[in-house]
Amino acid sequence: MLRHALLSLSLTLPLVFAACDGADRLAAPPVTAERFGVPNALVPSGGSIQAAIDAAAPGAVILISPGTYHEALTVAKAGIKLVGRGDVTIENPGDAEDGISVSDAGDGFALVNVTVRGFEENGVLLTGVDGFLLANVRAIDNGEYGLFPVFSSNGVIERCRASGHSDTGIYVGQSHHVIIFGSVAFGNVNGIELENSSDVQAVGNETFDNVAGILVVLLPGLDIKTSANILVAGNRVHDNNHPNFAAPGEIESFVPSGSGILVVGTDRTTVSQNVVTGNAFTGIAVGSTLLLGALAGLPPEAFADIEPNPDGARITRNVATGNGAASPIPFLPGVDLLWDGSGTGNCWERNRFGSSYPAPLPACVNAS
């Protein structure tokens, strides 16, 4: 049931965002506990959420009373829904790597109105989960990743916040049919990252004070070798000039600070109706994964298992102004709109911008 509801939501949301002015124009109602009906269990303040999960039947709705819970949670049952009532925080009890870990047995998982804070690696990790909902979740200072669905599908990340992560605040990796909307990411290396994924949308979000606001990327060495059909629309992407604090040697440590929206190696990516301002390197860039590899000092053969060039990118109807004040890359200028010349079928149309490289950029045929 939840899977079908999420599929319906992900298909209809693009119609909701006709104005595409950002998160404040979202028409979808916020998620509340009432959406899930009568709860099957109530965790009292000071109780154990994990004990409630262990005792629950598949499909159970678990309501969590206000309070701070020092425990790490594991979910391996289908349809579990954890719903916070009031101010609910899950904090690291010691040296736990993951705050909430959901396995591939946890299809239909939902997490609503909860803060996850201070875990060593990941705030919320979903691995192989089909049909998930993360709504009004706040991920704060969780090592590398805040919200981290991987090998997952048919998911919605709605009105979440993520800050203080040395890789990515809100990440979708090697997944398909996922939408991120109405969310805020700040103070991370990457605010939002869509990596080696297809049929994914990032719509109506705000990213600021990250190294890069939104990164859409195809990387080598992963199980999924392609990334296509990505929509980045109606987002506010501004002032992403944070110094890069990723672990030295990690590929994220070579993401250039001052980046608004980066499209790196993916195919058929549409970037439309975003407002992108105040990013010191570039507002919206389209380039090859080989460029990121060059910054990392990797040889071209390191990318032999992927086709690293972006094809079919459409950059339309964006406002990209006040970017490019100071490029950190000697061989590329700081501009509002940037293309490294790689790939085929990439085009730009009806954008409002002050500078581009090259100039002019290729125009779209049948622009929308």
Predicted regions and their residues:
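C-terminal motif of bacterial Sec signal peptides marking the signal peptidase cleavage site
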Residues: 16-19
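Bacterial signal peptide processing site
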Residues: 21-24
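Right-handed parallel beta-helix/beta-spiral solenoid domain characteristic of secreted/periplasmic
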Residues: 44-47, 61-66, 79-121, 125
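Acidic, glycine- and Ser/Thr-rich low-complexity intrinsically disordered tracts
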Residues: 63, 292-368
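Short glycine/acidic-rich loop motifs that flank beta-strands on beta-rich extracellular proteins
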Residues: 69-75, 92-99, 120-126, 143-150, ...
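Right-handed parallel beta-helix
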Residues: 85-88, 107-118, 130-144, 153-168, ...
